[in-house]
Amino acid sequence: MAKKEFQAESKKLMDMMINSIYTNKEIFLRELISNASDAIDKLYYKSLTDTSVGMNKGDFRILLTRDKDSRTLTISDNGIGMTREELEQNLGTIAHSGSLDFKKDNKDENIDIIGQFGVGFYSSFMVADKVTVISKAYGSDEAWQWESSGADGYELEPAERETAGTDIILHIKPDTETDNYDNFLDEYGIVAIVKKYSDYVRYPIQMEREKSRQKPKPDPKPDDYKPEWETYTELETLNSMVPIWKKQKSEVTDEEYANFYKDKFSDYADPARVIVSRTEGTANYNALLFVPSHRPYDFYTKDYEKGLALYASGVLIMEKCADLLPDYFSFVKGIVDSQDLSLNISREMLQKDNQLKLIHNALEKKIKNELHAMLANDREKYESFWKEFGRQLKFGAYSDYGMHAELLRDLLLFWSAKEQKMVTLQEYVDKMPAEQKYIYFAAGDSTDRLAKLPAAELVMDKGYDVLLLTEDVDEFCLQIMRTYPRKDAEGKDGTVEFKNVNSGDLGLETEDEKKAAEEATTANKALFDAMKDALDGKVKEVKVSTRLKDHPVCLSADGPLSIEMEKVLSKQPGSEGVKSDKVLELNVNHPVFAVLKAAQEAGDTEKLKKYSALLYAQAQLIEGLPVDDPAAYAEAVCSLMQ
C-alpha cells in the first residue's frame, strides 16, 4: 500500500516530538500504557450503559510481550479499539487526541481519562525504529494495521485481530555507545519502568515472567536423590492498581503508611506525621503527605530538591513537583494525584495554571493545620520535629519581607531563660506581667552566655522572661515580624513589640531614673568625649548606662542593626563593611568608673586611652565579639598589672 504523509507534514515537527518534548526515553512505556488505559476506560464506560458489551471491569487488562530475538516489545489492550478513520485521525495527525475528543463529548459525565494532547504515542520513536499498530474497533468486523518508521509517513492496510482492542508493536533500536535500548527488552528493566510510572493504573498490567521451581520428587526417592530445578513462565500482574492515597484513612494502618513512606522515599525511619488530604470542588485531588522524623543530609544545601510526586489519574507525571510546596514546607514529602491538572503535551512540565495554585494553597493550609495539631497534642514529637526543621520555618517567616510571618509565627519555638525550655510566642505573651512593655530577647551563640549578659540579667531581675536566640536567622525573624498580638488590660486586641536587650531603651526605668542617667551623661561629657576620641570611631557614643547592675561596661546598638545581626552579616560575602552603630555604656556606680574619672582629672591622657581600649575590649568579649587587637589587649592588661 502507498505510503501516506502525516497531516502535520513537517519533518521538523516530528523531530521535535521525538527529540525535544521528552527528556527521558523510558517514559515511552508510561505513555503507551496510559493510552491503553484510556482505550479500556472508553469500552468500560460503554459497558456500564450497554449490556451487549458483555464485559465487566475485571475482564480488562494491558498485556506486555517482549521478544528479544525479534527485538520487539508489544503493548496490547482489550479496549475500545480504532477504526481505519480513527487510526488516520489519531495516529496520522500529530498532536490530535482521541481521548480529549471523548472527554469533550462526555463532558457532563464523571469520566477520568488520562490522555489530552495526543503526542504521547510518538514517544515510541525515541526507542523504536519502526512502530506497528494493529487495531480493531469495538462493534466492527474489520481490523487495520498502521505502520511507520518515523517522519517520512505511514502505511495503512487491512489486518487480522479476533477481538476489539489494540496491539502496539515496537521494533526496538539496537544499542549505541550512549543508549542502552536492550533495557527496554529486559524483564527487570520493564518491571522497573512500570513500577516507577504506572504502578497505579487501575487495570492490571501483565507480562509473562520467567521463574524457577523445584521439580517434583520421584516416588520412590532414590538414595542419591538431588533436587532438580526447572524454569517456567507465568503471567504476572506488575502494578498494584489501587493507590494507598485513594483509600480511606480508616482502611490503612499506621504500619502500612510507614512502610509505604519508607519504601517510596528511601527512608529508614518512620515519618513524624502522616497527612491525608482529599478535596472535591474547585480543586479535585488526593494527597498523601509525610513529615519526616529527621532531615536529609543535604536539606540545608543548594543540592536539596523539594517537591511532591505528581500523578495524573494514577500515572506519574513528575517525581518532584516543586510548585506544590512553599519553600518553608520543603521538608514535606508525599504524593498528589489529580485528574484536573492542565498538562502540557509531554506531561513532564506543568503549566502555571490556576488549578495547580489551588492545590498548592490547599496543601499549604493543610500542612500548617497538621503542624499546629502536632504542637498542641504531641509537644514532645513537635519539639523533635523542630530540632530537625525549625530553622526552615524561621527562614520562611523572614523571607519575602515577612510575607508569611503571620502564617508561621505560631509554629515557632524559642528558648525561654525563665522557663528553661522551648516556648511559643503565644506562651511567652500569656505569661507576661501586665506592666511588661516588650517581648525581650537576646541573640548570640549560646544560651548560657546570653543568660549572663548584663542587660539580660537586668530584665530577668525585673521578673520578665528573655527569649535566648542562638541561630543566625532568629533575630532577623523577630525583627521582620516587629510585633505579636496581645490583648490589653481591657481585653481589646493590641500588639507588643520585640525588643533586643542590647538595643535602645528597654522600658525598665522610671522617668526619674532616665533623667538621672541623662544628667550624669551631661556631667561627664568631657570624659565620655575623650573616651570616644580614644576609641577612634569604634563607637558612636559613650554614655551612662541604665541597664548595668554589677558589670562596669557593656555595648549596645543604636539603630535597626544589632550587634548580633552585624556578626551574622559579616560572614556573608561582600558584607564586610556592614557595621552596627555601637554605644559604649558605663556603670557610674562601679569602682572602675572612679578610676576613669581619676585618670581624666589627673590629665593622664595615655592612661585614659589604655583604660578606654581595655573597657571596649571587655565589652566586646561580653558580647561574643572578637577583640580588634588581641596582642594590644594582652599588653595593656599586663602593663596595668605591673
Please annotate each region the language model reported.
Residues 1-184, 192, 215:
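GHKL (Bergerat-fold) ATPase N-terminal catalytic module, capturing the glycine-rich phosphate-binding loop
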Residues 113, 131-153, 173-183, 188-642:
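GHKL/Bergerat-fold ATPase module in large chromosome/replication-associated machines
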